[in-house]
């Protein structure tokens, strides 16, 4: 199962990229932070709760399909601000978030990743907007995605694997590896992405294993190591 902070529109490119690399994957193999957020919101709030979503139309549609009430624009009855990865971000959306947060609305974010990797380097992700809104309002959200354990727990629930049978592989200590640690499962920190070895000490999160890349992970599994 691939744990992605992106909405369905975002993980389709990931699906295509894996296919290009010869990795067989299907859309159902991806579990997003939006999936975990929907589960959390359904369990915490009443069915008639109105949400103001600062996110893409794809995210809003996913919430609507799950039966949640999403406001089209800023409304007085919006009880919860949900912040997600938003490639359609506008100043009007930020202002609406500030208005609701200053009024005391509940505040939830799908994930805390500061940047999103792109072909030209890094671009702001949900975590960067979290910091911007914190500067403006002093508020911090309840974060649902990694590093919280919900996504890993949901993946195990859907696949039927136990914690002893599960390992989380990722390139970010502060989200991926922390999620696995918080869920009580083994982790593999790969150094072929954003993270570097110094991040282990920086964030105080210890992975079970460290490997250079996914190829080393596959070679290790083929050899039957590590024990």
List the model feature ranges, each with a label:
Residues 4-6:
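Conserved phosphate-coupling serine/threonine residues in phosphotransfer and NTP-handling enzymes
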Residues 8-31, 38-227:
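Asp-based, Mg2+/Mn2+-dependent phosphohydrolase catalytic module
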């Amino acid at each position: 199962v691939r744990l992605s902070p992106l909405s369905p529109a975002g993980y389709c490119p990931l699906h295509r990229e894996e296919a290009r690399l010869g990795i067989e994957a299907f859309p159902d193999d991806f579990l997003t932070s939006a999936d975990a957020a929907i589960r959390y919101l359904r369990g915490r709030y009443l069915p008639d709760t109105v949400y103001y979503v600062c996110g893409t139309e794809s995210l809003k549609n996913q919430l609507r399909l799950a039966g949640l009430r999403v406001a089209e624009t800023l409304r007085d009855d919006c009880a919860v601000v949900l912040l997600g990865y938003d490639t359609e971000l506008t100043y009007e959306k930020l202002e609406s978030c500030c208005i609701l947060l200053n009024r005391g609305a509940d505040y939830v974010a799908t994930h805390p990743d500061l940047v999103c990797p792109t072909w030209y380097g890094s671009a702001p992700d949900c975590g960067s907007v979290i910091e911007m809104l914190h500067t403006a309002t002093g508020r911090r959200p309840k974060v649902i995605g990694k590093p919280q354990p919900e996504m890993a727990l949901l993946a195990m629930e859907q696949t039927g694997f136990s914690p002893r049978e599960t390992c989380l592989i990722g390139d970010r200590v502060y989200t991926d590896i922390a999620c696995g640690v918080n869920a009580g499962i083994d982790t593999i920190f790969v150094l072929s992405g954003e993270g570097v070895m110094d991040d282990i000490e920086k964030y105080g999160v210890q992975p079970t294993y460290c490997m250079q890349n996914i190829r080393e992970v596959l070679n290790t599994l083929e050899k039957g190591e590590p024990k």
